[in-house]
Amino acid sequence: MQIVTNTTLTKNNAASFSETIRWLHGLGIKNVACNTLICSGHGIEQKKENGLDDKALKEVLTAGCRTARELGMALQWYSPTCYHQGTDPIELGLGIKTCSAAAHNMTIQPDGTVLPCQSWPDSVGNILKDDWSSIWQHPTCVKLRGHLFKSEECRGCEYETSCGGGCPLDESSRTKSQGGRGASE
């Protein structure tokens, strides 16, 4: 059976992430994954209090990649990342990480509510009541697929086509691109 663990990296566990990878290796785990706090729901406050800045994130990912390589493990990075801010997943060997909401994945809740991603705060329709085309072409979905929530600072950046501006729920991106309003407004 293949098992993949996922660790949300925070100030509380960043220093021990490589140790966690070693511990998991000792249990026979071959695949580990990690992400950052997502700016949705309680994650907004948590990211302010416990989120890693770009320098710390790059350091912990670099160390984690090195540890996983030494142990012959696969490390996956799930968070869409703004490369210009200092953490380039391609440079770390983690591949292109861009927002895949409404493009490669959507979330359908038990009542049929459709979200562009599992963390998106607002519905784009209901799979039990709405035509798929109205959900797929919902203005929020179209903006997400076009990476139109990215900040002005991202436009013309050398990484623009690779990262797409990172996660549109990221508070810094949302604030820059939406004048402080929520990403879906």
Language-model segments: residues:
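Radical SAM enzyme [4Fe-4S]-AdoMet core and its adjacent flexible, acidic
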Residues: 1-119, 123-124
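Flexible mid-to-C-terminal extensions adjoining Fe-S/redox cofactors in radical SAM and related proteins
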Residues: 89-90, 96, 114, 119-185
